[in-house]
Amino acid sequence: VMDNLRLFDFRLDADSKKAIENVIAGFSPIPGDCGDEYRKPPFLTASGDLSHHVEAIPVPYPTTEGSDGRIKALSGTEWEDLAGFSRAVKKGNRILISGTTATHGAKAIGGNDPAAQATFALDKIEGALQSLGATMEEVVRTRIFVRNIDDWEAVARVHGKRFKDIQPANTLVQANLVGREYLVEIEAEAMVE
């Protein structure tokens, strides 16, 4: 550590600081928040944008088409099999996304942080939309259920960041959610043009 600190044992004069500021001013900032680099192109990794190395990015969840024309997406949680439902269903131009919690497989994600749980649930919703050929921009309605009403603002802020420019119809209510570890559950509806 001390060797690394010695590398920075120097002073910059005013001209050097100004030169650095001028270079930085020419940079294009990456918009968004931590984690956004994995949600929208360009997909930034430690190696840079790798999207040009693949012909197509695979969908997050497998889909199946029913005989009635419905397309179903399954995220693989234990709840889908147990209760007999799909993460999302597309019929015609309408997509309905089931109540979505911060669950990955059989594991709850986000601990006791309602904002982290809301972020993960919205990531799953976005994955379901992508699997059915849609985007978050096509969401027209969301419903948010919180276990503790005191968490409403933290959850609403997460929703606001993700839907800032989309502004779907929304309802947020307190509910006694299934599973003590879950603080947030979110439903969504989309219309694909």
Residue spans of the language-model regions?
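N-terminal presequence-like segments and the immediate start of the first folded domain
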Residues: 45-123, 127-140, 146-193
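Terminal-tail/helix-coil boundary detector
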Residues: 2-71
